[in-house]
Amino acid sequence: MAGVSSESLATALAALEAKLPTASLQLAKELFGILGMVDSSAGLRRALTDPSRNGDEKSALVRQLVGGKVSADAAEVAGGLAGSRWASARDIGDALETLAATVVISVAENKSAVSASGITGLEELENDLFSFNQAVASSHEVQRALSEPQASGAAKAALAEKLVPGVSEEAKVLITQAVTQPRGIKATRLVERFAELAAKRQQRWIATVSVTRPLTSTQLSRLQAGLNALYGRELKVNINVDPALIGGIRVQVGDEVLDASVISRLGELQRQLAG
């Protein structure tokens, strides 16, 4: 998303920020529901991107469609998006998805207590999303089931819950959305996007590190320090053990993939891990 759509999303996120301290998962579910309505109606998408309609008309149209069906906050957020300028119909859907996910992430962030393991609600959410994707990656049968176009959303949601039964309510909302309404991409890729939004919320990136064998605590600390220095910021590091990996180590940060063959960037990390 770029240009006018990016500006509209930034404006919407800024407006949403005022609602986040008291927002609940219900608001997120309502926004995801409105997203489903937009995605399922080509006529509505055309109306929302029709250059001959002004912003007030588009906003009023959406408020009329959702009025009485969702909360006032959800209607306000959706109406505000509709009244903004978008380069494409896809962009307004992506924006709704981002706002809904941001609400879920904020609910996790606002949890006052930490879990028994000592991690925050936001960290718990990230870990739960990562665990789901690992569970899917480990089973070709599950991957086929989640991508089966004839399977119902309810069946896919039930399967997801069986894969990771102990996840937080926040993670459950995002995972359910990803498997029932992936919007043309793999469910696991959408879960990754949600995890990236969660990491961005706490001003960190996610580094998925694949290694041939488990790291010791010392090696993990060195890896964390090396990656932080390499990127100039604190990263959230997830470790994936893959005995079949060629090269010893593979690091992915966002869309950037670094293999051990990139000696100029990972050579120092390899030396640190060998120490």
Curated annotation (Swiss-Prot):
Keyword Transmembrane helix on entry: no
Location in or out of the cell: Cell membrane
Stored PROSITE patterns: ATPASE_DELTA
Protein origin, superkingdom: Bacteria
Keyword Glycoprotein carried by entry: no
Principal subcellular localisation of the protein: membrane
Molecular functions per Gene Ontology: proton-transporting ATP synthase activity, rotational mechanism
Residues forming coiled coils: none
Pfam families according to UniProt: OSCP
TM stretches of this protein: none
Keywords: ATP synthesis, Cell membrane, CF(1), Hydrogen ion transport, Ion transport, Membrane, Transport
Cellular component aspect of the GO annotation: plasma membrane; proton-transporting ATP synthase complex
Membrane topology: Peripheral membrane protein
Role, per record: F(1)F(0) ATP synthase produces ATP from ADP in the presence of a proton or sodium gradient. F-type ATPases consist of two structural domains, F(1) containing the extramembraneous catalytic core and F(0) containing the membrane proton channel, linked together by a central stalk and a peripheral stalk. During catalysis, ATP synthesis in the catalytic domain of F(1) is coupled via a rotary mechanism of the central stalk subunits to proton translocation.
PANTHER family to which the protein is assigned, alphabetical: ATP SYNTHASE DELTA CHAIN
Subunit structure: F-type ATPases have 2 components, F(1) - the catalytic core - and F(0) - the membrane proton channel. F(1) has five subunits: alpha(3), beta(3), gamma(1), delta(1), epsilon(1). F(0) has three main subunits: a(1), b(2) and c(10-14). The alpha and beta chains form an alternating ring which encloses part of the gamma chain. F(1) is attached to F(0) by a central stalk formed by the gamma and epsilon chains, while a peripheral stalk is formed by the delta and b chains.
Membership in a protein family: Belongs to the ATPase delta chain family.
Name of the protein this chain belongs to: ATP synthase subunit delta
Organism: Pseudarthrobacter chlorophenolicus (strain ATCC 700700 / DSM 12829 / CIP 107037 / JCM 12360 / KCTC 9906 / NCIMB 13794 / A6)
Upper lineage: Bacteria, Bacillati, Actinomycetota, Actinomycetes, Micrococcales
